Structure formats: structure tokens, C-alpha cells
UniProtKB/Swiss-Prot annotation:
Pfam families: HGTP_anticodon, tRNA-synt_2b, tRNA_edit. Consists of three domains: the N-terminal catalytic domain, the editing domain and the C-terminal anticodon-binding domain. This is Proline--tRNA ligase. GO terms for biological process: prolyl-tRNA aminoacylation. Catalyzes the attachment of proline to tRNA(Pro) in a two-step reaction: proline is first activated by ATP to form Pro-AMP and then transferred to the acceptor end of tRNA(Pro). As ProRS can inadvertently accommodate and process non-cognate amino acids such as alanine and cysteine, to avoid such errors it has two additional distinct editing activities against alanine. One activity is designated as 'pretransfer' editing and involves the tRNA(Pro)-independent hydrolysis of activated Ala-AMP. HAMAP family: Pro_tRNA_synth_type1 (MF_01569). CDD domains: ProRS-INS, ProRS_anticodon_short, ProRS_core_prok.
Amino acid sequence: MRQSKFFMPTLKEAPSDAVAESHKLMIRGGYIRQVTAGVYAYLPLGYRVLRKAEGIIEDEMEKINVPEMIMPHLLPATLWQESGRYKKYGAEMFKLKDRHGRESLLGPTHEETFTEIIAKNLKSYKQMPLALYQIQTKFRDENRPRFGLLRGREFVMLDGYSFAATRDQLDEQFDDQKSAYKRIFKRAGVTVHPVIADSGTMGGKNSTEFQAPAAIGEDTIATNEKGTYAANLEMAKSIDTFKQEPEDAKELTKVATPGCDTIEKLAKFLNVPATRIVKSILYIADDQKVLVLIRGDKQINEVKLGHVLDADEVHEADSADLKEITGSEKGGVGPVDADWADKIIADETVKDLYNVVVGAGETDYQFENANLDRDFKVDEFVDIRTANEGEPDPVDHLPLKFTTSIEVGHIFKLGTYYTKTMGADFLDQNGKAKPVIMGSYGIGVTRMLSAAVEQHLTEHGVAWPKEIAPFAIHIVQMKMNKEDQTELAEKLEKKFSEKYDVLYDDRKERAGVKFADADLVGAPIRITVGKKAADGIVEVKRPTDDKATEISIDELDKFVNQELG
């Protein structure tokens, strides 16, 4: 490809509103251009990278015998209403009506559509296990699109779905997909951690995220140094090392605590450590009033809490509801005589405490020396706390390390979450009707590209991993009016183009402009044809090299083959 004919509008400076380094690079390098908030056009350079990534996915899916197909962007609302996700998905769904008033949506994902097709066309256990996938543009009405391709309103995604007759088949499919995903990310040059994750609105109970460490990441993952434990902070577990020595129960005493509306203020006022205080927080789970208890030095993890309560809607009671239900304002709520609560659950940190401080059920009052069983009851003890960095992990008891990261993939064991609701049944070996068992698998392809840039930035540009680089070799000719340079550059272009994608900079530009653009292209190998062309000498440079190295054209083949394989 001749660069003089290649549309690559580069910029010296990134737009002022670009925050993520990947966003800045892709704008400056002429990879993408914004059309509207959260929506981008992929220019030739960006589209080449996108197609390379899609090619890796197609290759790896072929290896595990998963065929590709394509679904429509425009989906009927009725399918999502049937699954119950039409309302649950929330404001991020693009909804519209046609001229006849029929409701539709732009697909953010396609579980319902695949399930409907399977329900109509898969009837016997003999047709399973089966898996399908597509690479397609998705839509999400982000409230605040930002960070370029990392959080857009339109994005490219691989979404795949598996269908099984037994749990064993699902487990095998899940493992195959997980292995394929690891290979995809490795080939794309993106370092990832497979981590325990929350399924969110997707349904199902078991899921694994693929998180790419990056400074701009919006997620936090907790790992140990051996790599034997990794989880999204939303689901991370840790070992609580605090132990209170047993004490004899003291007399329950009510004390005034004016203005102590935080744990810090209360601990200071009563001159007790936060570990001596039990926080009581009222949550509304559908129509149930649930009082949640946790030790004062810990924080409630609402994702874990949501799993425990297993309700369609869970939220902390606001001040008006709190006053109406408990008779107290925030800080005074407590578990003693809390007959108004439908259920009281407590974090495991509350289990072995003695003579603690709890809300007295009255604004600005607390009970001292409250004891479990004597003064209040708990219906269930569960892990609902947020893990803290440095706490021991639950596997090898090593300190947890927190890292910001980008979610680039997510795989789920959906089970029968959709198929039961949507009537996707099959006949088993005994002729009995059973719901198909599903898995769901996704890679944010455009997110993966942003993650690759974030992980492979150089001082002046990017060092693309070789399998997704827009060009493998970038030939830069210094002076276009020198016949010896032109002759050698064209010879190298013809030779290497037989095996690799080659960009030949044949523009009549200054050397500084050419090198600056080459840094933004980020090809694994840059070959500079300059003043020693007549002697059969060129310069080679990798994006991570500090400076170029002279090499004879006789040795160039060996160098290229070593670098590109």
C-alpha cells in the first residue's frame, strides 16, 4: 500500500477532551474520527486493525468448531419483554417505535434472539452440543460516553452462545471457549487476567471476566502474587484477620450520641475502635425490608448483597423511608427490637463480636454492650463485605493486590435462565421435554483494541502486537527524488508484500513528518531507505527501540523473519 494513496489524517495534538491515551493515539494517528458522542468512524488504518482482530477471533472459533452467523441489529421488543429484560436493562437500551407503533430496540446483546431461533429449530438431544457466534455492532445508550472506544454508544462485539443437553456438555463448552479466549487475547498481544465476576443483567450464576490491566481501566481486580486467585473487586473475597477476644456480656446501656452520623464520629465520641461498632443499614429488596449488619470498619458490597437477596430490585432505603419504617434517622437504626424488619442478615464479621455498639432505634442514640442472641437475632450470616487491598486471599492466604483494568471479555454459564422463560425445550434420550442449557460468551473487540494500545504505548506512538498491527512492515523512503532510494524501496515493497502487509511511505514530506507518522502507525518493523541505499544499506527499527540500526539488505530477510515469524 502506497502511503501517498492511503487516507491517514494525522494530528500533532490530540483533542482537548481526549483523556485515555488510547483515545488520543487513535485520533492523532488517524485511526478513528468521532461522528457524534460515543460513535466513531473507523478510518482505513483503524479498520485494518479491527479486521485483523476479527480474523484472529474467526480463526480460533473455527478451531473449536463454532460456526459464525449474523443477527439483525433491529430487534422486536416482544422478545425482551418475554425474557423480562426489557425493563431490567434500563435506560442504556436504545428503544424506538416504527410507523405502526410497534416497539423495537437496537441490540445491546442477542441472548433472546438466539434463544428464539433455537426454540424453533433445535428439538432433540442429538442436535447438541451446539455453539454459534457473531461479530457485530452493538448499541448502548451510555449516559456519559468517554475514553474513545472504551465506552461508546456503538461498538463491535463478538457474542457467542452455546446450547447443551447436560451440565457436563455446558462445562466442556465453557472450558473450550475459555481456552479459545485466552488464545485470542494472547495472539492479539493483550495481557488479561481471567477473574471471578458478577453476571449482572445477563442472568446465570457462574461467570468469568477477562480483565486487561490498564491505568485508564474503570474496573478493579484483586489478585495475589502467585496468580492462584483473581476476582473482580465486586466479587472478591478475603480473609478477615481481626479477632476479638471473648468477653463476658455486660449490661445493655442506652447512650446519647448527638451528631454522630458516621462511624468515625461515633468511634471518637465513645472512644471505641470501629471494630467495636456494628453498622445497621436498611435495604429494600422488592417489597421486603432487610436490615443488613456489618462491622464498623468494613463496607457493604452491594453486588454480593444483591446475590444473597436474589431480588429484582435492591436499594438502600432513603431518609424518608428510613424514618417511616424505623422511627430513626440514619445512624440510629439498629437490630435490637427491630420487629419492623422482614429479615436481618449480617456479614460474617459480626459473628464473633462481644459487647458492641449498635443503633438504639432512635435518632442520636446508641446501645453499648449489645450481644448477639441475647439482644438481637440474625437470620443469616453471609459474606457481603468489600475486600480490602493487603488482606489475605481465600486460596493461598497471600496479600491481595488491586489493579485497575479494562473488561475485554466475559463468559457466562447461563443455564436455563432464558430457555425456561422462552420455551426452548428439547426431547432427551427418554423422550422427556427439558429446557436447553445455555452459555454466553463475549469479547468487546473495539475495547480489546483500546486495551492493546494502552498496554503497548511508546514515547511517541504505539508498538502494535504483530498479529493486529495495521501493517507488518513500514518502508520509509527519505528522499523521493533519489532514484537509488526509489529503486530499493520499490524492490523491498514488492518482495515483502508477497508475505506481509506493507505500507510504503512514498510521500514528498520532510523526514521528521514521516518518522512522526511512522511512530503513530506502530508497525513491528520500520525500514528506512536513505542515503546508503546505493550501498545496499538500510536502517531498521522496532517501535520499542531507542534508535535505528543499520543493516545490509542481504541480512534483512533474516531480521524480518526473526521478528515476524
